[in-house]
From Swiss-Prot:
Its EC number is 2.7.7.3. Reversibly transfers an adenylyl group from ATP to 4'-phosphopantetheine, yielding dephospho-CoA (dPCoA) and pyrophosphate. GO terms for biological process: coenzyme A biosynthetic process. One of its GO terms (molecular function) is pantetheine-phosphate adenylyltransferase activity. The gene is coaD. It comes from the Bacteria. Substrate binds at T10, K42, M74, R88. It comes from Salmonella paratyphi B (strain ATCC BAA-1250 / SPB7). It is found in: Cytoplasm. This is Phosphopantetheine adenylyltransferase. Coiled coil: none annotated. Pathway: Cofactor biosynthesis; coenzyme A biosynthesis; CoA from (R)-pantothenate: step 4/5. InterPro entries: Cyt_trans-like, PPAT, Rossmann-like_a/b/a_fold. Keywords: ATP-binding, Coenzyme A biosynthesis, Cytoplasm, Magnesium, Nucleotide-binding, Nucleotidyltransferase, Transferase.
Length: 159
């Protein structure tokens, strides 16, 4: 049986920290679905279609990654995609408390859905899409934190 995992997030935009997690997940699972949440309540900078396109290009070198947008409840999305593993990145203790709540709710909604927590490599442990966007808005250099295509798209958005 194929191990299908979902790595969900808003990915507004996808960072090298996200790529670190998804790359490592591809070594653990047969198929990884990078599930980009519509998240209209977060008021993303990039549209869902833009985020999907940016992530597709950034992960094109990974043969077992599928990038899709979604707006459904995560448990329902996982069931529809026949995935029973949910990948989540943990940067700090504060992340764990929130992620634990999500994991328990997802397990309540879909008992066979296991949450797997991955810590990013040390190099990426402090970055988030929000932080990268904030630094970029103030003309800080965020080149190191983003795939090239994403960096260019962010610079274009901020013009």
């Amino acid at each position: 049986m194929q191990k299908r995992a979902i790595y969900p997030g808003t990915f507004d935009p996808i960072t090298n920290g996200h790529l670190d997690i998804v790359t490592r997940a591809t070594q653990m699972f047969d198929h990884v679905i990078l599930a980009i949440a519509a998240s209209p309540g977060k008021k993303p900078m990039f549209t869902l279609d833009e985020r999907v396109a940016l992530a597709q290009k950034a992960t094109a070198h990974l043969g077992n990654v599928e990038v899709v947008g979604f707006s459904d409840l995560m448990a329902n999305f996982a069931r529809d995609r026949q995935a029973n593993i949910l990948i989540r990145g943990l940067r700090a203790v504060a992340d764990f408390e929130y992620e634990m709540q999500l994991a328990h709710m997802n397990r309540h909604l879909m008992p066979q859905l296991e949450s797997v927590f991955l810590m990013p490599s040390k190099e990426w442990s402090f970055i988030s899409s929000s932080l990268v966007k904030e630094v970029a808005r103030h003309q800080g250099d965020v080149t190191h934190f983003l795939p090239d295509n994403v960096h260019q798209a962010l610079m274009d958005k901020l013009k």
